[in-house]
Amino acid sequence: MLTVKQIEAAKPKEKPYRLLDGNGLYLYVPVSGKKVWQLRYKIDGKEKILTVGKYPLMTLQEARDKAWTARKDISVGIDPVKAKKASSNNNSFSAIYKEWYDHKKQVWSVGYATELAKMFDDDILPIIGGLEIQDIEPMQLLEVIRRFEDRGAMERANKARRRCGEVFRYAIVTGRAKYNPAPDLADAMKGYRKKNFPFLPADQIPAFNKALATFSGSIVSLIATKVLRYTALRTKELRSMQWKNVDFENRIITIDASVMKGRKIHVVPMSDQVIELLTTLSSITKPVSEFVFAGRNDKKKPICENAVLLVIKQIGYEGLESGHGFRHEFSTIMNEHEWPADAIEVQLAHANGGSVRGIYNHAQYLDKRREMMQWWADWLDEKVR
């Protein structure tokens, strides 16, 4: 039988190994050095292994006691692995997330709740959903965050960390976890700084236009980039656009309230340039997708969140320009040319407290904004070197 001294002296080797205690119980020592108590047993003629607990969280005596209980269950036909799985289903990250989500979605808009559920279903639950929440370690959660960062989705990485943290806090207050690893990951993240999006000064816009004219990649991504510049929309708002949101007759794009940062409808007047671009695109994506900017591989989804950044990168402006930079340039130049500040703010869908700039009446300043957005599109087109 094992002694505490033998257990403490056990060091990781090039290959995993076991230290036998007796009656099927042993200490498993993997290459990582994280020791685990396991019990080998037979039931219904099949050999199985039960993970009893982690050392040193579970002492030698506690492991023996738990193994004894498991063997007692086996003697009356109860499979401890199946019993543990049934018990842990309610303590898995996925199960607790669903409880938390059902509780929180009551105060969210339908659009936001749908967006968040998609983020968890696509990128988080497939990795850690099946794990018991109390067993999830910081490195496992960091793996989730790294997947967002690796594709350049820094804002979404930060959102994923925060929302996972809320799930862990919910587990803690409901007695199913003792530790929230999410806050500790902040220093390990590449970071998302909202105020540091690159943008171009006005005198560099002609050179950018010339570079953009050389782009030979996806026509959908190219038109998305141009429309983003002409409209000063947020990338998220642009990607959400469906053909039902585009009214060619009245020359407006309507962005659903569920997508907007302020959760209120946003109406965007279309310049001649935008109408021409979307008319061209309608023959490409409208027959196959409800999305204006349909994804390349999955027409049921919009283009990826980094599509515009990839265009910018391909024409040599990585780190110098960005989708958010287009909005900054629009705001700066329109203010310099003394267009009405409130019309500019409404076009940008900026909410500033209780002031007039925070009022999202979809008809507000529409006539003035029609004139303003046509001027802006013409100004951009004239800047050719």
UniProtKB/Swiss-Prot annotation:
Q: What is this protein called?
A: Integrase
Q: What does this protein do?
A: Integrase is necessary for integration of the phage into the host genome by site-specific recombination. In conjunction with excisionase, integrase is also necessary for excision of the prophage from the host genome.
Q: Which UniProt keywords apply?
A: DNA integration, DNA recombination, DNA-binding, Hydrolase, Transferase, Viral genome integration, Virus entry into host cell
* Record EC number: 2.7.7.-, 3.1.-.-
Task: Say yes or no: keyword Transport present.
Answer: no
Active site per the UniProt annotation? 234, 261, 324, 327, 350, 360
Q: Which Pfam families match?
A: Arm-DNA-bind_3, Phage_int_M, Phage_integrase
Which pairs of positions does the record mark as disulfide bonds?
none
**Gene from which the chain derives:** int
Q: Which GO terms describe its biological process?
A: DNA integration; DNA recombination; establishment of integrated proviral latency; symbiont entry into host cell; viral genome integration into host DNA
The family database entries (PANTHER family) matched by this protein are listed as:
PROPHAGE INTEGRASE, PROPHAGE INTEGRASE INTS-RELATED
Species of origin: Shigella phage Sf6
